[in-house]
């Protein structure tokens, strides 16, 4: 079944303006470090990101050394963006 984000997700989070850019960032970001390596099942990673987004988190911290192995967190998050969040990008 396709993922459908919570309609009230932006009401659940405080957002702060980033300088004069007009960009708003959530008060809480989600770091995808050891919980997004190849040793974590894809369904678990998918559930983490979906829940965070449903709570209004729109900023996800990634780095090329997150894993293990290094880079696997970026690959996993990219796959979730492609499959679950294409309609919200």
Please annotate each region the language model reported.
Residues 1-89:
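N-terminal binding-site loop/beta-alpha segment at the start of enzyme catalytic domains
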